[in-house]
Amino acid sequence: NIIHKVLERFHGSEGDITEDQILQILDEEWKSGEFTYMQREEKLKEQAVEMLKRYVDNTKQEPPHVLDTELIFSFDLDGIRIVGMIDRIDNSPNGNKVVDYKTSKRSTPAKNSVQLGIYSLYLQQTEDEKLAGIPETATLYFLRDKEQPEHSHTFTETDLDSIREKITGVARGIRARRFAPCSGYHCDWCDYKNLACPAWES
């Protein structure tokens, strides 16, 4: 994802947080040859510029103290190998903060995010002293959201126990070859919707 790469470089560079800086990185990361239609490329570039300008405006008010970006991790959870990548980890006076960037149009509550819960589970057990411990906050940052881009939640031990149970339950289902369909808006772009999905059988 180009936006994720731009933000990784942006927070890894030294100096003040500026609009010119982030747009220069966008230009360097943008790969024009990967788009089939020029009109589509222009529209996507326009949207990227708008999102990043707004991000800078929001971020420069209280620049984060970034500990790490694009952190690849893995750990074992009750015999299940969990692998993932955390977009950004900040340090604040009250503890660490996990941030996950979203470019989707639909905003969702952070407290319902299994993804953020997994990040918190990893940090709870990591031996890296600067990162260890349940994050003070875990945040979904919706880059398209003009009104409230940040949706945050503090995961408790009870929350994490529930997420652990959910993950192990899914793993048991996969091992038993049980794949119950779960219909929703994500079905709109699923190739199996009209082919072999029992949830959409007429």
Where do the language-model regions lie?
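Non-catalytic protein-protein interaction segments used by genome-maintenance enzymes to assemble
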Residues: 68-127
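Metal-dependent nuclease catalytic cores in nucleic-acid-processing enzymes
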Residues: 5-11, 107-142
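Generic recognition of stable, solvent-exposed alpha-helical segments in well-folded globular domains
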Residues: 1-5, 17, 21, 43-50, ...
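Metal-dependent nuclease catalytic regions and adjoining charged, substrate-binding loops involved
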Residues: 20-21, 124-202
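Secondary-structure transition/capping motifs at alpha-helix termini
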Residues: 13, 61-62, 92-95, 126-133
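A non-catalytic, helix-rich entry segment at domain boundaries
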Residues: 2-72, 76
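Glycine- and acidic
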Residues: 10, 32-38, 98-105, 152
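Short amphipathic alpha-helical segments and their helix-coil junctions
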Residues: 27-33, 95-99, 167-173
